């Protein structure tokens, strides 16, 4: 009967694995980072998938208790044997023994708390440290976290002193309740911020995505901003690498700090090193490192520049990847705008990519036209109406879930109606739908959060390890209060509605939707008001307007800056299209020139036998032998060679003959595979092997 729980565990593991594969770069990141983030994401998803089973299990236990009381009351009221007993309770789907959920929640709770408060912060600080030994990295990580957690301990000490002054007796259970309340307080207020934004932004983004014109304008705007970010990242990398070039020239090869310099240099790609060397030679070292060009750096200076190199290279790699993805998005939207009025009803792309056999069968050009140009917009508008209705229900229930009599929460009323008929299937499906919407709103906001440009989850394997760990910490800290909030909405938190229903196993282990006693007075008033205030501010785009006023450009219609950035994005995309067209033409010419012509070889073969019989032995001209018709043997390689035939060689062949094939240029774009699939496949074959060292790569 535990098949639903097994299915939930498998679904959580699959979803976490797919998400980690999409955002992370598993072959290149350390195994400890992969396992920690996978565990954090899997446990967070598992909580969401398992809560409905705990709810139905609790309702079933309450049904058994009520059934027993009804039987006892019927037996006491009459001694006759003809009294009809009350209907028996039916077990819900996926019923498990009573000991399963308490043990499961304990494992998830303590593992998540251990990861989010101890392991992952230390791992994050370890990755950011610029030291060159394990001991140095651990020391820097411990110092950074000691400062971070020291502030928490100071606040906890103040709270304990306050409680002691109030005369409240303290024991282990009291301290555990205080810690749980503090964690819930932090999580609930962060949840207010995320849900207040997402409950409005999710339906609005679906509606805007149904408008091709708006989507294309916004894509141009994002392209302009990404181009600026990419230029700033490149400039920052050049400045840091110029300082690194100064240090590399100053530190001699036999110096004790030379291995540290080599460790930093190994982090920098070869092309960036060559560009930095050219810039250094051109400027004569007059950049950032010129003032200390004759002074040997200290180990602390090398640690500092090592940390800067790691951070700047990660930012550059992420901005380049996002720029490539954004260019592909804009080109696709332009293709949609171009094909929307097509009479052929076949989707044609300006830069077609290689399609697999399955794509050509199940997603042909005709099907793609019907989806992109005809069906996608109505589908997104329908989803917008559904999500807007769900958002309105969530906001209303958040505002009214503290009302015990009458019950005003929509979600609580649905659970009560299903409970009266013991319709556990409806309860499970409804709970899963609501939790999945909570899950999508909260986690989609986390995935798109851009905290001071340090942590950002970029798809297509472009997310660094720091951002993955940060997202795992947020999920572990937000999931318990999010589920407690849901249990409060359906009136199954005994600390909010004590007389309604039995307590779930989840609230027994995870705690209740309580807050610190100092701020608990009036919580049922300002909690809904904060939720409503954030929703209204998102509806009127107050946050975007404030950021725009502070100089952080936001996409606001009828704004001069936004219009200028849209036009700049159009120009950048037009330039990128011309560059891709030139690259495709150059590759096509190169492939055509290097492809041997079978007609030339056959003509040379026939001329050899035609001229061999009638040629005079004594009449030789300077041109004789150019076609190698004097030999008895036939050299196919020589015949097929363009140089043997007297055809002028190209510049690339001349360079290859003089300096070797390794000097030839490959024209292409990072992140695109449609230009030359053979070249991309060769690159993939070349980089296959053991992944580079990650966490302990400096040791």
Curated annotation (Swiss-Prot):
Locate the transmembrane regions by residue number. 4-26, 31-51, 107-127, 145-165, 182-202, 382-402, 427-447, 468-488, 515-535
Region annotation (Disordered) ranges: 669-699
- Identify its membrane topology class: Multi-pass membrane protein
Q: Which residues are glycosylated?
A: 76
Q: Does the keyword Metal-binding apply?
A: no
CC annotations in GO: membrane
**Name under which the protein is recorded:** LMBR1 domain-containing protein 2 homolog
State the species of origin. Drosophila pseudoobscura pseudoobscura
